[in-house]
Amino acid sequence: MKNTFSRLFGFGDKESEFELQDESHEEIDKKVYEEIQEIPIVNITPNRYQPRTVFDDARIEELALTIRTHGLIQPIVVRQYEDDKYEIIAGERRFRAATKLGWEKVPAIIKNLNDTETASVALIENLQREELTAIEEAVAYQKLIELHNLTQEALAQRLGKGQSTIANKLRLLKLPEEIKNALLEKSITERHARALIPLKNEELQLKVLQEIVEKQLNVKQTEERITKLLEEAKPKRKAKQKAVSRDTRIAMNTIRQSLQMVADSGLNVNSEEEEFDEYYQITIQIPKKK
């Protein structure tokens, strides 16, 4: 299937190196080798828009061994931004592997792209490889939105992804730096990180992060812990309490006052108070006729 990212993001034919599927092998070889140049490694700088922030040294070492055995099959892609100064558009892992091998020059295809095009190609090229961490992917989506003034829905349509996928990734960017770093270092999974979002309180989020790492909580255990914290944070409803006095003297005086009020009304009320070990007893006699 032909790569459609160039058309979708308005690059025209500037990413044609990614769209060679419809050409014959002879045409491909002729076209590619005409454009390849050997560029001194010291004149090449990484892409400032590179979404990948963590490079696995072991994977770079493996790639270097493969290149040493089979050569660099796919040249890197660069743009020239000053005389004899080049910026990588695609292929930073290959560039790092060649540097590790001690190469002085590296085969490269030079493309004439502006800043926006360079950033977009670098971001898209990395997104297609599916090796980015969740945070790196979120950063790539955010940069594409800003570069092309897109909504989340529009970006999702252009990338062939669900809008919820884009939204869920972007929510991760609101988490504290410590949690984003844990994602980058793969100390926690994306689902762990997403579970922390409802807590809102940064102090609580970091507290649970520490528990996840130290106790090696799985996602279900993390969600249960967070649910408990959210329940504890809810304001407690105060139960209505009847005013009950445990002071027997107040109770006795209240009864006596009531009896006096009845007597003052003209009724001849007889009352008798008795005290026992466990209780007081008041016997009241009210005549049926006045």
Swiss-Prot record:
Keyword terms: Cell cycle, Cell division, Cytoplasm, DNA-binding, Septation
Ranges annotated as DNA-binding: 153-172
One cellular component (GO) term of this entry: chromosome
GO biological process terms on file: chromosome segregation; division septum assembly; positive regulation of sporulation resulting in formation of a cellular spore
Family of this protein: Belongs to the ParB family.
Function per UniProt: Effects nucleoid occlusion by binding relatively nonspecifically to DNA and preventing the assembly of the division machinery in the vicinity of the nucleoid, especially under conditions that disturb the cell cycle. It helps to coordinate cell division and chromosome segregation by preventing the formation of the Z ring through the nucleoid, which would cause chromosome breakage.
Protein name (record): Nucleoid occlusion protein
Source organism per UniProt: Bacillus cereus (strain ZK / E33L)
Gene that this polypeptide is encoded by: noc
